[in-house]
Amino acid sequence: MKTRGTFGEVQLGALLDQMLSPEQYEANVKTKKNATEFVEFAIKLPGKENNNDTVYLPVDAKFPKDVYEQYQDAYEAGDAALIETSSRQLEITIKKMAKDIHDKYVDPPFTTDFAIMFLPFENIYAEVIRRTALVEMLQKDWKIVVTGPTT
């Protein structure tokens, strides 16, 4: 599991490095007061009160590889019941990941009131965003925006 997480983190870091200057983001940031968790990356935004204050936008890479592979295998097998089961499991996993990001890293006014979940493979990202109700629920309930390598 750590290898998967590391891969997504490396890919996300490379993308941020291409798009932002080093002053515009930080790696391994503690975004919640009195917390022990560190978000992989946080984009630095100016604070309301003072330009020296920083508000962080948490960005966390997630890679639901096993669940997504089960979903793909079900489609390849053409098993309708297995497709339905693995589809539900994929949604459950994405929801848990979104809740995890929100609970660990979102803490206004020190952070934005939302965070970004980065999915490191375009096929996983495409599968998630085609589920409009899921994306809307993630945004409404957990204030999580899903992104992928090309977004």
Label the model's feature ranges:
Residues M1-T151:
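Amphipathic, heptad-repeat alpha-helical coiled-coil/stalk segments that mediate oligomerization
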